[in-house]
């Protein structure tokens, strides 16, 4: 790590802390030449493999933007969308892989979105699962109701 003050190539770590829900490390460093102190943030890169074969860095903002469309006209706050995006990132990072398929991100969005707003969930699922008719919506609603009943029985 080069010192931002004197460009010397050696520094020592004084302090390290996990930040951003474990997805990054903040390190306080001291230059061994000029004793200047500076902070670095180290983050493991998570790449998204898109359907066309292109890879790009994971973006929470893209998750928020996609889910915001499904939530249009619904009473869902920006903070809720940001928390959902963080939850999705934590889910896909927990796979332990540095690369995740775009399809897996969509899958990771479904459950937290359903908990947040069922109408937004149906809108998102209709695109993600390529609904073609009202029957597809009806099947999904029946599935949601069954899962809701099962959850109530478990909490019982």
Curated annotation (Swiss-Prot):
Record's cofactor remark: Binds 1 zinc ion.
Annotated S-S bridges: none
Co-factor requirement: Zn(2+)
Keyword DNA-binding: yes
Domain (ATP-cone) ranges: 46-136
Molecular function as annotated in GO: ATP binding; DNA binding; zinc ion binding
Annotated zinc fingers (unnamed), start-end: 3-34
Membrane-spanning intervals of the chain: none
Pfam family, one: Zn_ribbon_NrdR
Entries under InterPro entries matching the protein: ATP-cone_dom (IPR005144), NrdR-like_N (IPR055173), RNR_NrdR-like (IPR003796)
UniProt entry keywords in alphabetical sequence: ATP-binding, DNA-binding, Metal-binding, Nucleotide-binding, Repressor, Transcription, Transcription regulation, Zinc, Zinc-finger
GO biological processes: negative regulation of DNA-templated transcription
PANTHER family, per the entry: TRANSCRIPTIONAL REPRESSOR NRDR
Family per similarity comment: Belongs to the NrdR family.
Purpose: Negatively regulates transcription of bacterial ribonucleotide reductase nrd genes and operons by binding to NrdR-boxes.
Name of this protein: Transcriptional repressor NrdR
Organism of origin: Corynebacterium efficiens (strain DSM 44549 / YS-314 / AJ 12310 / JCM 11189 / NBRC 100395)
């Amino acid at each position: 790590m080069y010192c931002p003050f004197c460009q010397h190539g050696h520094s020592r770590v004084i302090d390290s802390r996990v930040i951003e829900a474990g997805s990054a490390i903040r390190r306080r460093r001291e230059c061994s030449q000029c004793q200047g102190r500076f902070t670095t943030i180290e983050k493991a890169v998570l790449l998204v493999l898109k359907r066309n074969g292109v890879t790009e860095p994971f973006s929470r903002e893209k998750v928020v933007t996609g889910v915001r469309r499904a939530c249009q006209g619904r009473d869902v706050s920006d903070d809720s969308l940001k928390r959902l995006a963080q939850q999705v990132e934590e889910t896909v990072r927990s796979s332990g892989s540095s690369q995740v398929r775009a399809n897996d991100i969509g899958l990771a969005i479904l459950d937290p979105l359903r908990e947040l707003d069922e109408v937004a969930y149906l809108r998102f699922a209709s695109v993600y699962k390529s609904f073609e008719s009202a029957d597809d919506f009806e099947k999904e609603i029946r599935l949601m109701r069954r899962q809701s009943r099962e959850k109530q029985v478990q909490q019982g």
